[in-house]
Amino acid sequence: MTPSLYGAVKSRANEALVESLDYCKWALQSVSRSFALTIPLVEDALLAPIMVGYLEARILDTFEDDIGKRHVSLEERVRAMNAIMEILERPDSKMADRKAQELASQADEWVQDEHYRGLVKNFDKVLTVHRSLDERTKASMVKWMHEINAGMQKYLQQPVYSFEDLNEYCYFVAGTPSGFLTEL
C-alpha cells in the first residue's frame, strides 16, 4: 500500500487546503530530485509537515542562490529571505498574505529557474498548508528555518574559504533539516 502524501491533514481539509496540498505534491515533484522520491514514503502523520518544510526551505534557498533574470542585489536577497521568515513567524496575519503576494509578484524578474519561480509564485498555497499544521510543528519548522536562513545569509556575505567554512555551510543547508525531522 502506498502511503497518502497528505497524511492526517487531508482528512480534515477544506477545498482550499486540498487544492493547496495537491499543488504542494506537484511542486515537490517539480523542484526536487531526491526528496521527491523519499518524502512520499514517510509515514502519513509526517508527510505534510516534511513536504511543506522542504518547500519553504526551497523558497528560501531560491532567494539565496537563483539570482534571476536581472542582477538582484545582496540587500534585496536578504530582504526577501527575511520577509519569508516574517511570513512563517506570523502565518495567519494579513502581513503574511501581503508579503507572500509581494514575493510572488517579484518572481518573474528575480527567479530564473521556471520551477522555482512557479513555487515562489504559489507561496500562498504552501502557506495554506503551513497554517493547517499543529502549533508545535509550526514552531519547530520556524526554529529550524531561522537556522537555515542565518547560515545562508552568512555565506551570502562571505565566501566559503576553508573546509571549516564548507562544513558549517553544509550544516546550515543540509544538517538543519535533520534537526527538524528529529523534532517531528
Feature locations, PLM:
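Acidic catalytic motifs of isoprenoid enzymes
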Residues: 1-184
